[in-house]
Amino acid sequence: MNVLNRDDIKTFLPHREPMLLIDDVTMDGDTAIAHYHVRGDEFFLQGHFPGNPVVPGVIQCEIMAQSSCILVRDELVGHTPLYSGINNVRFRQPVRPGDTMEIRARITSRRGMIFFVDAKALVNGKACCSGELTFALIDNK
């Protein structure tokens, strides 16, 4: 199992700071296991909520989506992954500064260049977010 760091991840994903939201990822068979440490100075915490910062749910979903795209890293050359759907998302506990999210993502099916993924995010072993994600690989122009 090779661990990809942020520099490695940038060779596959088009995301860059401040929108690159995974710190490392490891492939374990058909599952991507990624991490993101919430530092507390992220742009999305400004105003969400003053004095009680919580990672917005949509950002948690984006973290899961980026983690999922690593599953098809060999097919990303010449393509951009676009998040195209989300189903059955549940938020179970808040994610706060100082927390490290662990994301587990697995492709459940594929239709051409469209991928369906089950993803779950945990903090300290407890589920904070889960859902079914869909993304498509589109040709770069």
Model-predicted segments: where are they?
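Short, low-complexity, intrinsically disordered N-terminal peptides in bacterial proteins
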Residues: 1-2, 141
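Flexible, low-complexity linker/boundary loops enriched in proline and small hydrophobic residues
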Residues: 3-24
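Residue-level signal for pocket-adjacent positions within structured domains
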Residues: 4-8, 39-40, 44, 49-50, ...
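Active-site helix/loop of acyl-thioester processing domains in fatty-acid/polyketide metabolism
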Residues: 25, 55-78
